[in-house]
């Protein structure tokens, strides 16, 4: 049934007796529309007008106490008979806190308020949610209890605390580093494969002044000193960048030279492993940053086998061999 529309009218008279008589003799005409015959072409066949006695209307109202009526204007009402679907979307609020009440709570309260007041309700169910840490701990304890033999006895000490979770063993050394790549200050020497190098060396060396300029510098560069030494039968090359006046730059090494090696090539904007263009101090000819170690003016044969190198100096790892 789609709906019941009351079409009967109320005629108000001046006399009280006539009004009571008319109310007793009043009949209600109801317009009924059938939804089962919607496919019929004739519209009059799906619409009927019924007459409902007052006694049946009174019994209908008493049998449906939850039925609602909307007053459009005096004398005409719309009775909403299908409340089953509309009641599903209605939410009940808690009488204490105003939050949404539990659906099955007979006291119309939320779980917290209903439980705090001590009401006997079926919604007082303990939550089955377990934190992740406790679940992981239970799984580990179950795994240790199921593991047999020496595995169970060895892991029993770790799980004896209950709350302590065994962790992985962490390597104290950083990834990508090794003890052989760092030179400790207290070590007397460094051994790499078959070669053995001293921890500190001191000797005379020839430093050549060169002008360093990058590709994006636009011709502006800075002066640096380049040298090549022989230590332990191996050839080492390096460039010493200008670090500024001695008063503004505190040297970290024990040498008294005004020019120190840069740890990352920050002084000239270039890196020793990616050398920029080198220009000689006197001439304007640009050349690559490679010097022949066998030249008499640059490398002396009577040079001692050791030379002083302050800590932090970087060299070419693979120098060209003649």
From Swiss-Prot:
Report residues binding Zn(2+) 1.
94, 97, 105, 110
Distribution of this protein across tissues and organs: Expressed in seedlings, roots, cauline leaves, flowers and siliques.
Q: Does the keyword Membrane apply?
A: no
| Bias (Gly residues) ranges | 147-163
Give the UniProt entry's GO cellular component terms. Answer: nucleus
What residue spans carry the region label Disordered? 1-25, 132-196, 247-286
Q: Does the keyword Nucleus apply?
A: yes
The source's domain of life comes to: Eukaryota
Which amino acids does the record list as binding Zn(2+) 2?
94, 110, 114, 121
- One of the GO BP terms on file: auxin-activated signaling pathway
Annotated membrane-spanning segments are none
Q: What is this protein called?
A: Protein SHI RELATED SEQUENCE 2
- Source organism: Arabidopsis thaliana
